[in-house]
Amino acid sequence: QLAQGSHPAQQRLIFEELVAHQLSLLARRAYIQQIQAPALPSSKVLAKQLLAGLPFKMTHAQKRVSKEIADDLKQNKPMLRLVQGDVGAGKTLVAGIAACHALEADWQVALMAPTEILAEQHYLNFKRWFEPLGLNVAWLSGKQKGKARSAAEAQIATGAAQLVIGTHALFQDNVKFAKLGLVIIDEQHRFGVRQRLALREKMAEQNAPLPHMLMMSATPIPRTLAMTAYADLDTSVIDELPPGRTPVTTVAIPDTRRTDIIDRVRHACITEGRQAYWVCTLIEESELLEAQAAEATWEELKLALPELNVGLVHGRMKPAEKQAV
């Protein structure tokens, strides 16, 4: 029983740990709900201008989730909401609409992603959406140095940067926000509770109102599990794909069938003319972690698929190198 984890004493300990985790999150939520946050009225102009410039319409699910967020933002207590939805469901647009409420009320918005590649993708999207509307979108990453870094930090500190996109660099002590009203975190499961509260605490140190917090995840989490693991969060689900979007199929295949997977990649790229992405946990091989490394996998796939052009992209590459790929 001990080896299988089924001993009554073990199960009791597990139960008590889960209860303690749940209670601590609920207590944290109750504490945060007593703290003042900026009440952000629904956007009357900016959201309409943003949607008018897009070549598509929002789905019913996007509208429903956007209303849930707007109802939270109207309150003078901090929003804590998790938005779930498959890849392609339109979470980024929902985040953009949420940003409109804060921006129109003259508050800053910070969007944080776990990797530089994902953060840069958001930066390009939000810059394309918001700069034509007269808003300044700033970029901040750990790799920025010298004058570029100082200029970005100065814009954030003075409020000249109304929308700030970045990575963990947004956590750093020397990054000061002038008037932060909304924090958006993508792939929130990549951040711990302590990490996702760090930006809030930055404002508490400045005796400023706590910003609202919106988290997004494409990882399918059953609602009951979300209620257990993220007891401090309200949950919204975008359960509808835009017209023309194919539902995502997720399949787990053991590494023993690696050659089968490579054959499927070959068929998809050559026969069907598609692109394939092979995502690895690490950049280089590690003696401490048993995980696939991007550089080793790239070499392997080049040998296994000589008829294909196999590219490599990772966070340590220079922007020009990534752009070339």
Feature names for model-found ranges:
Residues 1-53:
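Upstream accessory/linker segments immediately N-terminal to the RecA-like ATPase cores of bacterial MutS
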Residues 7-11, 39, 55-58, 214, ...:
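Generic alpha-helical structural element
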Residues 20, 52-55, 270, 306:
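Generic surface-pattern signal
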Residues 21, 25, 49, 53, ...:
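Generic, well-ordered alpha-helical scaffold segments in large soluble proteins
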Residues 35, 64-67, 77-325:
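Inter-lobe coupling/hinge segments of SF2-like helicase ATPases
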Residues 35-84:
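Conserved pre-motif I regulatory segment
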